């Protein structure tokens, strides 16, 4: 089934009206010039409103040109106003196997430090090895008072590390293994010499990575297990949580995933609820990297009780036992 794209934006509608209204006012069409204008208007309507597999023709053209312009992977932009720190989460000491997403979400605003987003990312391999990280992205503008109280030089990275250590301590108190994560402990999503194609990133004839946006709706608790059940060498899944604009009680959520396979990705989504990032895999995978300071696409108001209904995979025992002391930061 060919998915229908979102409702056209104002700019797209305005351009169509600029082409259609003069032709409509010229009715009845009698001269050759009138019919030429009619043809131009029809072409504009088809070009701006036409779509294929959920993407407007103009979006397809723009992404195709972007692939040609990209000679290498997009580097994370340098910034001194945003930083991301990571906490690894290991298996719990008790019988519980449900990651406390509601508790983790409370660290969006905890101990006077406000996070722009909190992201839970899991990587599961074909052998069943599972690793999970919780990323906190902190923005300087949202924490000026807290930063100035600590130092006159605005120690953004140190402040974010404090939040990460407190989250790790809290998780350990309730029975989970946890600690701050070092940059070299995060596996690469894509090899540096991979080449972007329309359907994914190609490293070799038997190594492809495809990115997908996941619909963050009421069906998300069913979508995530369906993604994990797909055959793949690696499955990356991320859930990002943020406060809704102007609120400190309502959440927005976004989700994304990436599948590493030894075959070329198909042209359609492998699971209902996924939107392939055709022609946009480099930006999507760059944002999906657990160390990224970028937000995931597609933030929407969180359905009621979504976090309590989501079952996040439990990391395998021993996967994170290496002593880690440094927090990840992209500044």
Swiss-Prot record:
Q: Name one GO cellular component term.
A: plasma membrane
Q: What induces it?
A: Repressed by IdeR in the presence of iron and by Zur in the presence of zinc.
What does the UniProt keyword field contain? Cell inner membrane, Cell membrane, Membrane, Transmembrane, Transmembrane helix, Transport
- Please name the Pfam families in this protein's record: EccE
Q: Does the keyword Cell membrane apply?
A: yes
Annotated TM spans: 11-31, 37-57
Q: Which InterPro entries match?
A: EccE_dom, T7SS_EccE
Topology in the lipid bilayer is annotated as: Multi-pass membrane protein
Q: Where found, per UniProt?
A: Cell inner membrane
The free-text function statement in the UniProt record for this protein reads: Part of the ESX-3 specialized secretion system, which is important for iron and zinc uptake or homeostasis.
Q: Report quaternary structure and partners.
A: Part of the ESX-3 / type VII secretion system (T7SS), which is composed of cytosolic and membrane components. The ESX-3 membrane complex is composed of EccB3, EccC3, EccD3 and EccE3.
Similarity comment text for this entry: Belongs to the EccE family.
User: What is the name listed in the Swiss-Prot or TrEMBL entry for this protein?
Assistant: ESX-3 secretion system protein EccE3
Name the source organism.
Mycobacterium tuberculosis (strain ATCC 25618 / H37Rv)
């Amino acid at each position: 089934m060919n998915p229908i794209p979102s409702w056209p934006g104002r700019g797209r509608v305005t351009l169509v009206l600029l082409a259609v209204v003069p032709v409509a006012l010229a009715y009845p069409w009698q001269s050759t010039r009138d019919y030429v204008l009619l043809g131009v208007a029809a072409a504009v309507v088809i070009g701006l409103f036409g779509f294929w597999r959920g993407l407007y023709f103009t979006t397809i053209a723009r992404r195709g040109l972007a692939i040609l312009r990209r000679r290498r992977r997009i580097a994370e932009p340098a910034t001194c106003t945003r930083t991301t720190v990571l906490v690894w989460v290991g298996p719990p000491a008790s019988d519980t196997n449900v990651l406390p997403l509601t508790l983790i979400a409370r660290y969006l605003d905890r101990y006077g430090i406000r996070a722009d987003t909190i992201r839970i990312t899991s990587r599961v391999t074909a052998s069943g090895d599972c690793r999970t990280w919780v990323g906190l992205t902190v923005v300087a503008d949202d924490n000026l008072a807290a930063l100035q109280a600590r130092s006159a030089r605005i120690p953004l990275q140190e402040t974010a590390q404090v939040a990460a250590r407190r989250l790790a301590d809290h998780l350990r108190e309730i029975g989970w293994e946890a600690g701050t994560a070092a940059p070299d402990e995060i596996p690469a999503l894509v090899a540096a010499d991979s080449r972007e194609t329309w359907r994914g990133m190609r490293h070799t004839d038997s190594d492809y990575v495809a990115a997908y946006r996941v619909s963050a709706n009421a069906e998300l608790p069913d979508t995530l297990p369906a993604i994990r059940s797909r055959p793949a060498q690696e499955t990356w899944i991320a859930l990002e949580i943020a406060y809704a604009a102007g609120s400190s009680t309502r959440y927005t959520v976004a989700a994304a995933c990436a599948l590493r396979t030894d075959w070329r990705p198909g042209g359609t989504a492998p699971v209902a609820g996924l939107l392939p990032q055709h022609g946009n895999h480099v930006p999507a995978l760059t944002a999906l990297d657990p160390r990224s300071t970028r937000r995931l696409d597609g933030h929407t108001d969180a359905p009621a009780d979504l976090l309590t209904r989501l079952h996040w995979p439990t990391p395998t025992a021993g996967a994170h036992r290496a002593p880690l002391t440094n927090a990840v930061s992209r500044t």
